[in-house]
From Swiss-Prot:
It comes from the Eukaryota. It holds the Pfam family Thg1. Changing N46Y: Significantly affects the G(-1) addition. It catalyses: a 5'-end ribonucleotide-tRNA(His) + GTP + ATP + H2O = a 5'-end phospho-guanosine-ribonucleotide-tRNA(His) + AMP + 2 diphosphate + H(+); a 5'-end ribonucleotide-RNA + a ribonucleoside 5'-triphosphate + ATP + H2O = a 5'-end phospho-ribonucleoside-ribonucleotide-RNA + AMP + 2 diphosphate + H(+). Its EC number is 2.7.7.79. Mg(2+) binds at D29, G30, D77. GO terms for cellular component: cytoplasm; nucleus. InterPro entries: Thg1_C_dom, tRNAHis_GuaTrfase_cat, tRNAHis_GuaTrfase_Thg1, tRNAHis_GuaTrfase_Thg1_sf. After addition of G(-1), THG1 removes pyrophosphate from the tRNA 5'-end, generating 5'-monophosphorylated G(-1)-containing tRNA which is important for recognition of tRNA(His) by its cognate histidyl-tRNA synthetase. In addition to the single-G(-1) addition reaction, THG1 polymerizes multiple G residues to the 5'-end of tRNA(His) variants using the 3'-end of the tRNA(His) acceptor stem as a template. This is tRNA(His) guanylyltransferase. One of its GO terms (molecular function) is 3'-5' RNA polymerase activity. Its cofactor is Mg(2+). Keywords: Acetylation, GTP-binding, Magnesium, Metal-binding, Nucleotide-binding, Nucleotidyltransferase, Transferase, tRNA processing.
Amino acid sequence: MANSKFGYVRQFETHDVILPQCYIVVRIDGKKFHEFSKFYEFAKPNDENALKLMNACAKNLVLKYKNDIILAFGESDEYSFILKSSTTLFNRRKDKLATLFGSFFTSNYVALWAKFFPEKPLNIKHLPYFDSRCVAYPNLQTIKDYLSWRYVDTHINNLYNTTFWQLIIKCGLTPQESEKKLCGTFSNEKQEILFSECGINYNNEPEMFKKGSLVTRKGEILHINVIAQIDELFEGY
């Protein structure tokens, strides 16, 4: 950068750095994706192509930074990228990690859109974009708990959304009626409603919907019981 008498303004810039020895999670979330998915008529409760598009973007990001990323996990319109505690990527700067991961993911989403939605060209007034946050986690157990949290959240959200939408699609309920019917119900009760009233066995739903998607450093996309394999996933880290 050229020197000039105006260069003093750089003194006002701040660069937060993630503490050393901490694991780093960069989590990306679709911004206003409720409106976005409605405009492009995503299938409810899950749009398989939309999820596969998210997975493709995540895979490209993981492979780009495979020396720093342990794994990535995604559900719906979010993805979490877990970085090694020893990473020096972008000098561990919070702003760089959050903005570059977010922009890389967004650009891939736009570039790959036509592959997954060839009959739905992107509208300039309804473009996808993602927010991104960067969080430090102090030890291995905490990062395992983080991934377990996102995995459990996937199950809870998908079971609710599946039951909610099937009551509307198959049973003719209004959104308000479906919400009221599910209010206060537990997981086993939702599964019973799905089976007895909608004729759907939740256990037979696609693994990607129920378990989310995990991307390994090699770019493999898996749909597994994360909690059952949590120690194996972080072996050596």
